[in-house]
Amino acid sequence: MSVGKIRYQIGDKAALLEAVVARECEIIDLRRDQWRTQLVSCPELDRASVTDIVAQVLDEAVDAGHVSAIVMAEIYIQAYRDPALEPLRVRLWAHDHGFWRGLFEGFPEARGLVRRIAYYSIDERVFSVLLGQSRDYRLLRQSTLRALLRPAGAQGRSAASAWHLHLIAQLAGPAQAALEGASEIKGTKAVLARQIADAMARDGVEAISFRQIATSAGVPLSTLTHHFLSHRDLVLGGVEELYRRMRASLGRPGDARAGRQVLLLTHEMALGALRDSRLTPFAIDMRRRRAENVHAQVAPLVDGEGDRARSQAFTMALIGEAIALGEQGQQPGSAAFPVRLCELARD
């Protein structure tokens, strides 16, 4: 059962969530100690070696650690929506950040990269679980990691940027048919889809039920089930409406509220896609577009002009920071995000 279902369907289960987070913190610390044992006899690490280590840690999230990766993503997102979960977020982040700090504390060159790696990993982890079996995705992730860890002032080669864009296109291609299916709908079904989307934006995907939507829309349950035959159809109808809204909001880079919704819903789409593969194209496209939307703003601040991989990598790191730090984080579109981005790029 997901964290969202615990929160919405079971009720206030603070003690249960506290126990879940405590267990995840123990797992994080155990994995940190295992990695430190692996690295203890290594005299030094360069950035290429750090890239390899981060990729391996993410691969482990796909395999034996996938349950923990999903739980952590859900805790962070639910805490972003529910201030009552803030203490759990703070505790989880302390151990999550401590994992990377513990790995690299003995390596001066790697130590300065810990913050950007930790933030990037927050954004990346659930997508590695969702898409980690895809060759194109794994290659894209490796390209992004190299760009994230490249020293400031070390421009990426044009061939590397072309390769990165090629991988993005390869990954987006198979999703196109499904995205084209999210065409505009009209009439009663469109009104209901907007109600579903409003509920998702407010409470998250896990909160959606036939009874809730029928009540908020003021229609009989039979009317709702006529247009949406199953719970999956109900969710997909709301997702398609949110997707259309997101496409419109991405034309307004300064819209902080829209940016927050995209941040939350992109991760919720990835989590939802782990249960229903029909959501996967939306998760892929939302994630791609959120980085493309702020490329012009991000690139000059991170030595990434003409380098899509680097601007995408730092966008991911900044989004990870916003998720990890809650209201203290600076998401793309906020007034303080240029300063924060420059700080990350100087590590």
Identify the residue ranges that each predicted region occupies.
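Generic hydrophobic, amphipathic alpha-helix propensity
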Residues: V20-E24, I28, T188-I196, I213, ...
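Hydrophobic/aromatic-rich alpha-helical bundle segments in the mid-to-C-terminal region
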Residues: E86, V90, E105-I168, T280, ...
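Basic, helix-initiating cap at the start of DNA-binding domains
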Residues: L165-D203, F210-T215
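Amphipathic alpha-helical packing segments from all-alpha helical-bundle domains
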Residues: A64-A73, Y80-G106, G259-L264, S277-V302, ...
